[in-house]
């Protein structure tokens, strides 16, 4: 093994911000046997908005043609593994425990409403969700503050001579 890392679920984390937050949540739920912890900052939980997208937006990433090139047929995204809510419902129905979730979003972020909705959805399913809101928008000032909170939330060995790690790195 080139890197002596733990392969245990409880030692494996995934995180992202904005569209990467969506990706971390989606992949963390899809690969729930791999990831024990998921963190999403200002996550782009905008699948409902995609169903009504057209090509009139000045922002390329909001255009229907762009979204279809990434996600495929937008009329089908609510009932497939692209949708984190669908994945979570499927896990719940099968009795699969959820990874621990940390979600945070700025009070001035346009993604605040969908993040609150996803938090509520996961709480209703009984997931272990740590959720925070604070001053800021969809910007690095917010993410820089909250990534530190993510690191504090994760089960890391903060006193190791090897630096911040899971405590499962063998040198």
Provide a role label for each language-model segment.
Residues 1-171:
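Non-catalytic cap/lid and distal C-terminal segments of serine-dependent acyl enzymes
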């Amino acid at each position: 093994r080139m890197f002596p890392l733990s392969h245990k679920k409880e030692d494996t984390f995934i995180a992202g911000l904005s569209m990467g937050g969506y990706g971390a949540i989606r992949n963390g739920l899809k690969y729930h046997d791999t990831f024990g912890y998921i963190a999403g900052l200002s996550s782009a939980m905008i699948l409902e908005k995609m169903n009504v997208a057209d090509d009139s937006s000045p922002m390329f990433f909001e255009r229907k043609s762009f979204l279809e090139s990434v996600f495929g047929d937008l009329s089908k995204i609510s009932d497939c593994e692209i949708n984190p809510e669908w994945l979570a419902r499927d896990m719940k129905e099968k009795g699969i425990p959820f990874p621990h979730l940390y979600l945070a979003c700025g009070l001035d972020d346009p993604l605040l409403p969908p993040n609150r909705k996803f938090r509520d959805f996961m709480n209703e399913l009984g997931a272990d969700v740590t959720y925070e809101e604070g001053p800021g928008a969809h910007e690095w000032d917010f993410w820089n503050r909250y990534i530190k909170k993510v690191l504090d939330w994760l089960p890391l060995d903060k006193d190791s001579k090897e630096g911040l790690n899971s405590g499962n790195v063998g040198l």
